[in-house]
């Protein structure tokens, strides 16, 4: 099988894997409202945190990251070049953003993109996670944390393993474009902050 054929097959496989909406499936399994219809309307871990609590959000985060990590890492093991790895990672993110199995209404692609970056190395994964967590704790804005972490990701990659700077920059660009509306709301002071589902008070 030629390298081009293998790359195209992995792009299709990555898109299909990305199209499995973890947020919708976890909410269905746990008897929670459809995240596309509740909260921010975004089927991602942050919105599931709002409507279903931390454990449900953690499950969504794990599976969303896995959707990006698995096809990208498999392609790396197959010897596919760095630029093609970036295209495969973008395909997984586009599956998450425009899922064929869920009416093409998906999330922002942040967890899937960061999952695709994580196999580059533990050090990069730690830098990305630490940046996002610190920024969320400081600002309370998940979107702002994602945007700034996406901007930092190519710099981290260039510093740690410059072979993958271009594909990571491709993913970062996609994340920022996907957050265009969030950027506008942040500038207007209208963006929602991160909050957990409130537990009912005991009688």
Swiss-Prot record:
Gene Ontology biological process terms, A to Z: phospholipid biosynthetic process
InterPro entries: G3P_acylTferase_PlsY
Transmembrane segments: 6-26, 82-102, 118-138, 141-161
Keyword Transmembrane helix: yes
Catalytic class of the enzyme: transferase
Catalysed reactions listed for this entry: an acyl phosphate + sn-glycerol 3-phosphate = a 1-acyl-sn-glycero-3-phosphate + phosphate
Membrane topology designation: Multi-pass membrane protein
Keyword annotations of the record: Cell inner membrane, Cell membrane, Lipid biosynthesis, Lipid metabolism, Membrane, Phospholipid biosynthesis, Phospholipid metabolism, Transferase, Transmembrane, Transmembrane helix
EC numbers: 2.3.1.275
Subcellular location: Cell inner membrane
Assembly mode: Probably interacts with PlsX.
Purpose of the protein: Catalyzes the transfer of an acyl group from acyl-phosphate (acyl-PO(4)) to glycerol-3-phosphate (G3P) to form lysophosphatidic acid (LPA). This enzyme utilizes acyl-phosphate as fatty acyl donor, but not acyl-CoA or acyl-ACP.
Name of this chain's protein: Glycerol-3-phosphate acyltransferase
């Amino acid at each position: 099988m030629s390298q081009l054929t293998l790359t195209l097959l992995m792009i299709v496989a990555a898109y299909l894997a990305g199209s499995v909406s973890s947020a919708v499936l976890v909410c269905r399994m746990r008897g929670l409202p459809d995240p596309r219809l509740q909260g921010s309307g975004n089927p991602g871990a942050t919105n599931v945190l709002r409507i279903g609590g931390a454990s449900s959000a953690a499950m969504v985060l794990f599976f969303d990251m896995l959707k990006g990590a698995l096809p990208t890492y498999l392609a790396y093991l197959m010897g596919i070049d760095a630029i093609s790895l970036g295209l495969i990672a973008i395909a997984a993110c586009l599956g998450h953003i425009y899922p064929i199995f869920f009416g093409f209404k998906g999330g922002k692609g942040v967890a899937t993109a960061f999952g695709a970056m994580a196999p580059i190395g533990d050090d990069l994964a730690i830098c990305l996670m630490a940046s996002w967590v610190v920024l969320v704790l400081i600002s309370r804005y998940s979107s702002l944390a994602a945007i700034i972490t996406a901007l930092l990701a190519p710099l981290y990659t260039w510093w740690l393993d410059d072979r993958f700077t271009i594909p990571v920059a491709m993913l970062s660009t996609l994340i920022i474009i996907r957050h265009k509306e969030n950027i506008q709301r942040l500038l207007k002071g209208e963006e929602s902050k991160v909050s957990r589902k409130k537990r009912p008070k005991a009688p």
